[in-house]
Curated annotation (Swiss-Prot):
One of its GO terms (biological process) is translation. GO terms for cellular component: cytosolic large ribosomal subunit. GO terms for molecular function: mRNA binding; structural constituent of ribosome. It comes from the Bacteria. InterPro entries: Ribosomal_bL12, Ribosomal_bL12_C, Ribosomal_bL12_C/ClpS-like, Ribosomal_bL12_oligo, Ribosomal_bL12_oligo_N_sf. Forms part of the ribosomal stalk which helps the ribosome interact with GTP-bound translation factors. Is thus essential for accurate translation. Homodimer. Part of the ribosomal stalk of the 50S ribosomal subunit. Forms a multimeric L10(L12)X complex, where L10 forms an elongated spine to which 2 to 4 L12 dimers bind in a sequential fashion. Binds GTP-bound translation factors. The keyword Nucleus does not apply. This is Large ribosomal subunit protein bL12. Keywords: Ribonucleoprotein, Ribosomal protein. Belongs to the bacterial ribosomal protein bL12 family.
Length: 123
C-alpha cells in the first residue's frame, strides 16, 4: 500500500521541530535541491570576483514574545549559558544568541527559539 500525501503530512505533523529540520536536510541532499526561497537577481558582480556563499550565520533574538520563561530555557539549552546570562540575552533583545553558526545549526536554533515563542532572525 502506497503512502498518500495525507499520511505523509500527518507523519510530519507529529514530528519534533528538530526531526523536521533533519528531514528537510535529508531531502535536500537526496534530491539535490534547496528549501530556501528564490531570491530576485541582484546586480551582476565583476567577472573577476567570484561570489562566495555565506557559510557562517548569526542567530539574533529580536523579541522574546509572551513566553519569556520558555525562551530563556531554549537559550540556555542551545548555548549552555547560566540562567543569569540567558535571561540577560532575552531581556536585552535584540541580541545575538549564537555567532558563526553553520547553516544547519542556525536553522535548528531558530526553529527551537520560535517554538518557544521568540522572534528570531538569521543574519
Amino acid at each position: 500500500m502506497a503512502l498518500t500525501k495525507e499520511d505523509i503530512i500527518n507523519a510530519v505533523a507529529e514530528m519534533s521541530v528538530m526531526d523536521v529540520v533533519e528531514l528537510i536536510s535529508a531531502m535536500e541532499e537526496k534530491f539535490g535541491v534547496s528549501a530556501a526561497a528564490a531570491v530576485a537577481a541582484g546586480p551582476a558582480a565583476d567577472a573577476g570576483v567570484a561570489a562566495e556563499e555565506q557559510t557562517e550565520f548569526d542567530v539574533v533574538l529580536t523579541a522574546a514574545g509572551d513566553k519569556k520563561v520558555n525562551v530563556i530555557k531554549a537559550v540556555r539549552a542551545a548555548t549552555g549559558l547560566g540562567l543569569k546570562e540567558a535571561k540577560a540575552i532575552v531581556d536585552g533583545a535584540p541580541m545575538t544568541v549564537k555567532e558563526a553558526a553553520s547553516k544547519e545549526d542556525a536553522a535548528a536554533l531558530k526553529a527551537a527559539l520560535e517554538e518557544a515563542g521568540a522572534s528570531v532572525e538569521i543574519k
